[in-house]
Amino acid sequence: MDLQKVLPQMILLLLFLNLSPLGGHSHPLGSPSQSPEQSTMQKLLELIREKSEEMAQRQLSKDQGPTKELLKRVLRSQDSAFRIQERLRNSKMAHSSSCFGQKIDRIGAVSRLGCDGLRLF
C-alpha cells in the first residue's frame, strides 16, 4: 500500500470519528427536562381528550334513543306498505275472477266455475 494514499484517508477517518457524537446518538440542544410551557400544554391536551371522549359518550347515548324511535317508525311504515301491497294483491285476485269479456256457454251454475262461483274472500 502506498503511504501517500493511505495517510489522508486515515486522517479523515480520525477526524470523522472525533467529531461524531458518542454512542452514535444525537444529543438535543435543550435540557432533558420538560419546560413549564410544555407540561401545561400536555395537561391541556389531556383535558381536551377527556372532554372529547365524554362528549362522544353523551352523543352516543343521545343517538341511541332517537335511533330506537326511528327504527320503530321505519318498521311501522314497512308494515303499512306490506298491508297495502296485500290489499292490492287481494283486490286484483278478486277482479280476475269476474266474467267480464269471457264466454260462459259450457260453464253451469252447478259446477261453481261461472261468475261469482269462486270467491277468494
Swiss-Prot record:
GO terms for biological process: blood vessel diameter maintenance; cardiac muscle hypertrophy in response to stress; cell growth involved in cardiac muscle cell development; cellular response to mechanical stimulus; cGMP biosynthetic process; cGMP-mediated signaling; coronary vasculature development; endothelial cell proliferation. Belongs to the natriuretic peptide family. The record marks R76, S77, S91, K92 as: Cleavage. Residues 1-26 form the signal peptide. InterPro entries: Natr_peptide, Natr_peptide_CS, Natriuretic_peptide, Natriuretic_peptide_brain. GO terms for molecular function: hormone activity; hormone receptor binding; signaling receptor binding. GO terms for cellular component: cytoplasm; extracellular space; perinuclear region of cytoplasm; protein-containing complex. Pfam families: ANP (PF00212). It comes from Rattus norvegicus. This is Natriuretic peptides B. It comes from the Eukaryota. Transmembrane segments: none annotated. The precursor molecule is proteolytically cleaved by the endoprotease Furin to produce brain natriuretic peptide 45. May undergo further proteolytic cleavage by various proteases such as DPP4, MME and possibly FAP, to give rise to a variety of shorter peptides. May be cleaved at Ser-91 by the prolyl endopeptidase FAP (seprase) activity (in vitro). May be degraded by IDE. During IDE degradation, the resulting products initially increase the activation of NPR1 and can also stimulate NPR2 to produce cGMP before the fragments are completely degraded and inactivated by IDE (in vitro). Keywords: Disulfide bond, Hormone, Secreted, Signal, Vasoactive. Induction: Up-regulated in cardiocytes in response to stretching for 48hr. Induced by lipopolysaccharides. Expressed in the atria and ventricles, but at much lower levels than NPPA. Expression levels in the ventricles are slightly higher than in the atria. Very low levels of expression detected in the brain, hypothalamus, lung and aorta. Disulfide bonds join C99-C115.
